[in-house]
Amino acid sequence: MRNPQPDAALAELLVSVAAKQPACRSTETGSATTWSIGGMVFAMLDGGVAEFRLDVPIAAAAQRTPDTSASPRGSEWVAFRPGLMDHEAADRVTAWFQAAARRATG
């Protein structure tokens, strides 16, 4: 998945992964899309930045991967801005979305 437009590829991938989560709901507000389960927001996309609410140890490890940083939302959140949506970036997005969704279901 090599895409010269990482923002569009990131959005497309998130929509695809979310569609496989039956209890997942998406909400669009302005330029941002949030995903929640049972009212708990666990992921969001705003422009080319995706954020995921993970367990703290996973979030800390995720911050050591390329294009990833701490989120201003707190220690459970990571922000991911891929420069290129290659296979590795897509794998991280998919895994983090799924982990965040599992966490939201308790």
Residue ranges and their predicted role:
Residues 1-106:
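Charge-dense, helix-prone N-terminal extensions
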